[in-house]
């Protein structure tokens, strides 16, 4: 049987590194279909840190796409597992027959599913991408994204799968012992990316709570984002006093980020698509409830796991937040499907499906 090849078709260092390390540490030892990768971006020590994997790096999207298409045409039994899919050339290859549906398996990352960009080239490309998506052999996604995808592509097979968030299961019960009182701290957004709609989120938080809460805005990623960070800072200072606004413009190491999250009382995410599942997982693990946009389909995954969900359209106050914290504290977090190690079973099944080992 031909070994499955995994494709990271866009240079997204943080997510690509997470996926590679997860496969190296959790999957490669038990499956030959978890070892071959084609990745856009620089090695930057990844090969050394992932010795169980065979990783081929490409300088750009186009060069990777050309290599994938050549492999697909040379051997129609060759299957590919696309993790996120931000590579237009690959979509066009699927649409034109360069890559066959039986060769194309796609793990939706959220941002690559929704049509939120307003630029002309995106508006021209989106209809073609929708046509190509009808030809995918199988999609893997959160419950909410599967539901969203099925509305336009009901005939495409869908399987539940969660991004492998880096988590320490031993911390699942730690939050239950913490006493929460005094001024609330609210985390706004999961990164410095504009898709977090930071300014709109800050205004929404201020409308709900006024200048009575401390707001923390992590903006250390992506790099070279100084102009937008300053824009958010000025908008924040027009709403909150200086001591109540903390904008982080340095990228935090994992343990420092975890410590930051555990100081919060609430996470506030205004974006209308599924994203930031890693931050949501870490907040929930710490017993911190999250406010979501009702258009963000991840609320379906949360309610399926019996987790409290607050919405941006709700009338929020401290009593409601504390009640959500109490409800979250009563949940057995060891049973949550999108937590580590529970998501591992979904990945093992996904590999078997994509490799053609199970129907």
Swiss-Prot record:
Which reaction is recorded as catalysed by this protein?
beta-D-ManNAcA-(1->4)-alpha-D-GlcNAc-di-trans,octa-cis-undecaprenyl diphosphate + dTDP-4-acetamido-4,6-dideoxy-alpha-D-galactose = alpha-D-FucNAc4-(1->4)-beta-D-ManNAcA-(1->4)-D-GlcNAc-undecaprenyl diphosphate + dTDP + H(+)
Q: Which pathway does it serve?
A: Bacterial outer membrane biogenesis; enterobacterial common antigen biosynthesis
Tell me the InterPro entries matching this sequence: WecF
Q: Recorded E.C. number(s)?
A: 2.4.1.325
Domain of life according to the entry: Bacteria
Q: Name one GO molecular function term.
A: 4-acetamido-4,6-dideoxy-D-galactose transferase activity
What are the cysteine partners in each disulfide bond? none
Cite the entry's keywords alphabetically.
Cell inner membrane, Cell membrane, Glycosyltransferase, Membrane, Transferase
Major localization listed first in the record, in broad terms: membrane
Q: Report the locations given in the UniProt record.
A: Cell inner membrane
Gene Ontology annotations of biological process type:
enterobacterial common antigen biosynthetic process; fucosylation
GO cellular component terms listed in the entry, alphabetical order: plasma membrane
Its placement in the membrane is given as:
Peripheral membrane protein
NCBIfam families, per this entry? PRK02797.1-1, PRK02797.1-2, PRK02797.1-3
Q: Which family does it belong to?
A: Belongs to the glycosyltransferase 56 family.
The free-text function statement in the UniProt record for this protein reads: Catalyzes the synthesis of Und-PP-GlcNAc-ManNAcA-Fuc4NAc (Lipid III), the third lipid-linked intermediate involved in ECA synthesis.
- Name by which UniProt lists this protein: TDP-N-acetylfucosamine:lipid II N-acetylfucosaminyltransferase
Name of the gene this protein is made from: wecF
């Amino acid at each position: 049987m031909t070994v499955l090849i995994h494709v990271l078709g866009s240079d997204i260092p943080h997510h690509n590194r997470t996926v590679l390390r997860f496969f190296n540490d959790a999957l490669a030892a038990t499956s030959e279909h978890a070892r071959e990768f084609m990745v856009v971006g620089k090695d930057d020590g990844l090969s050394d840190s992932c010795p169980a994997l065979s990783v081929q790096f490409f300088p750009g999207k186009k060069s990777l796409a050309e290599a994938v298409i050549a492999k697909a045409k040379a051997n129609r039994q060759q299957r590919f597992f696309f993790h996120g899919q931000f590579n237009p050339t690959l979509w066009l290859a699927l649409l034109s027959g360069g890559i066959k549906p039986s060769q194309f398996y796609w793990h939706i990352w959220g941002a690559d599913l929704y049509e939120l960009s307003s630029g002309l080239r995106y508006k021209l490309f989106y209809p073609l991408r929708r046509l190509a998506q009808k030809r995918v052999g199988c999609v893997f996604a959160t419950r909410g994204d599967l539901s969203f995808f099925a509305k336009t592509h009901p005939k495409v097979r869908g399987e539940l799968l969660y991004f492998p968030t880096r988590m320490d299961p031993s911390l699942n019960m730690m939050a239950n012992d913490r006493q929460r009182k005094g001024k609330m701290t609210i985390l706004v957004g999961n990164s410095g990316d504009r898709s977090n709609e930071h300014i709109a989120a800050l205004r929404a938080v201020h409308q709900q709570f006024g200048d009575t809460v401390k707001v923390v805005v992590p903006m250390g990623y992506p790099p070279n984002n100084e102009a937008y960070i300053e824009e958010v800072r000025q908008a924040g200072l027009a709403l909150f006093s200086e001591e109540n606004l903390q904008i982080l413009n340095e990228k935090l190491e994992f343990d420092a980020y975890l410590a930051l999250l555990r100081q919060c009382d609430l996470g506030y995410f205004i974006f209308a698509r599924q994203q930031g599942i890693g931050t949501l997982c870490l907040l929930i693990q710490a017993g911190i409830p999250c406010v979501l946009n009702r258009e963000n389909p991840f609320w379906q995954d949360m309610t399926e796991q019996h987790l409290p969900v607050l919405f941006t359209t709700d009338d929020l106050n401290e009593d409601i937040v504390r009640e959500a914290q109490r409800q979250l504290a009563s949940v057995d977090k060891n049973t949550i499907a999108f937590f580590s190690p529970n998501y591992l079973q979904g990945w093992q099944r996904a590999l078997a499906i994509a490799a053609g080992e199970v129907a």
